[in-house]
Amino acid sequence: MKLRLYHHPDGARIAYREAGTGPPLALLHSRGLSHREWEPIVDELSHRFRVVLPDLPLHGASEDRPRHPYTPEWFTSVLSGFLQDACGPRPLVGAHDAAAVLAVRAIAAGSLKPARLVLMPSALHRRPERSPLERCGRAIMRAAVVPGCDRLLSHAGALAIRPQRGDRLSVTHAPGARDLVRHAVQDLGGNANRARSWAKAAKRWPSGAQHDLLDAYPQMDFPVLLLWADSDAAHPLAIAEEVLDLLPDGQLRVLPRTGFLIAYDDPIGVARELVAFCG
């Protein structure tokens, strides 16, 4: 895959990979992982699309300098600018977890108008369900804003998120899940800048339900696919059903025997649904 860089007007950078030719299809990974979340489906999709795989800010090789605000509004601005630059004015977009929230926020703000949108398991308008480990990691990152604690806590965060976590994210114990998590945190230990920036983001990201998104769904006047996992405890099917009821042009597909790492648990199914929906 080709590695490229996008530079936002405020200097923030997005590192992204491209594979294939055809209409651009951007796939936005979940919080805490990287573009590698989509590796199992890239080969299949690249026969039909120019697959665009960014590392979102604070992830991978993308922006992590603490000079930026890292508010939801800032994330949506950078994301919208990137998609406009890399994929054009009406991109095909797939988004998972927190990236799905950012995509809907960008649409509500009028800065993103996708031709088609695929929303994969996410809390969306509901209060996020976090495991004890995730709550611990969030507390560690919030504390990194204290001067002198950033480098120490970056090591603590890397130790708290072990590769074995990948086993809990995949219901099929998919090969590669541990490597995915290992790659996602390999640059965290000792990275004081990233720790401080994560602390900003953790402090400024809403911790409760985001009910304002309920007003955005009826305004999404383009085709939307809710591609859901049947065994992701943090993102039950009821979330997708609530969204479906409010969409003017929505459809729901549920993949059996899939968990949080939906593209690892059923890469064939995910690729099939994306091709069928995005054309």
Which stretches of residues belong to each language-model region?
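Conserved HGGG/HGGXW glycine-rich cap/lid loop of the alpha/beta-hydrolase fold
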Residues: 12-61
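Conserved alpha/beta-hydrolase catalytic His-Asp/Glu region
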Residues: 119, 128, 151-219
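Short beta-strand/loop motif that positions the catalytic acidic residue
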Residues: 220, 226-228
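Catalytic active-site module of serine/aspartate enzymes centered on a nucleophile-bearing elbow/loop
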Residues: 250-279
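Flexible "cap/lid" loop of the alpha/beta hydrolase fold
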Residues: 108, 115-149
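Conserved alpha/beta-hydrolase "acid-adjacent" motif
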Residues: 233-239
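Hydrolases whose catalytic domains are alpha/beta-hydrolase-1, hotdog thioesterase
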Residues: 102-106
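Active-site loop/oxyanion-hole signature of alpha/beta-hydrolase fold enzymes
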Residues: 53-98, 130, 272
